[in-house]
């Protein structure tokens, strides 16, 4: 067969359902958040820290890292100190816990600052999709039927802990990325593929 045609599956070979799992988790998350997103006019207002911190932190740091908010003639090093945070604070100290370690935050920098309040739901959908995909990669090694890995991945992604802690948006980064670390550890220990795990 040519490179453009896949070879037929051998008897007993597992079918990879990674993208199915990612899509299923993204669709499920979209169905969960979409009614609230529409009722709130494109915003997702949840509770507590999500409204007062998470949305504003994403929006503020998006503009801050792009150079917004500096006084005219400012000669200092940009993007390191914020007078708008607390009584003035180094941004690495103030935002590393919430944002700087999050690949989802860095992805959000591709969009304009004013879009960030509207992007919170798409970012949440992405986090749940990534969590489901990672859980599938980890679980598929331990099941005979890949459908059980899909089911386990969906149960992991939409566990009570993950859904409850939506208002701590940065907690979901751990839910999304942890299964990839587990899968990489299994690859290193079981399959002796040591290339990926050191990066975790």
What residues fall within each predicted segment?
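Intrinsic-disorder/low-complexity, polar/charged segments
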Residues: 13, 48-49, 102, 145, ...
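Membrane-embedded helix bundles of polyisoprenyl
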Residues: 25, 129-141, 147-200
């Amino acid at each position: 067969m040519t490179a453009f045609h896949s070879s037929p599956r051998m008897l007993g070979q597992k079918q990879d359902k990674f993208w199915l799992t990612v899509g299923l988790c993204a669709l499920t998350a979209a169905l969960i958040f979409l009614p609230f997103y529409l009722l709130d006019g494109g915003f997702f207002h949840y509770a507590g820290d999500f409204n007062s911190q998470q949305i504003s932190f994403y929006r503020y740091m998006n503009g801050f890292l792009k150079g917004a908010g500096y006084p005219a003639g400012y000669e200092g090093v940009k993007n390191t100190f914020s007078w708008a945070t607390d009584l003035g604070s180094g941004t690495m100290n103030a935002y590393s816990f919430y944002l700087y370690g999050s690949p989802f935050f860095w992805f959000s920098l591709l969009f304009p600052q004013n879009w960030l309040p509207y992007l919170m739901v798409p970012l949440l959908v992405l986090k749940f999709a990534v969590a489901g995909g990672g859980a599938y990669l980890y679980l598929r090694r331990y099941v005979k039927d890949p459908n059980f890995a899909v089911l386990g991945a969906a149960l992991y992604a939409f566990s009570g802990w993950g859904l409850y802690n939506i208002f701590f948006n940065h907690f979901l980064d751990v839910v999304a990325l942890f299964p990839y670390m587990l899968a990489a550890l299994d690859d290193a220990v079981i399959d002796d593929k040591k290339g990926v795990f050191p990066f975790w």
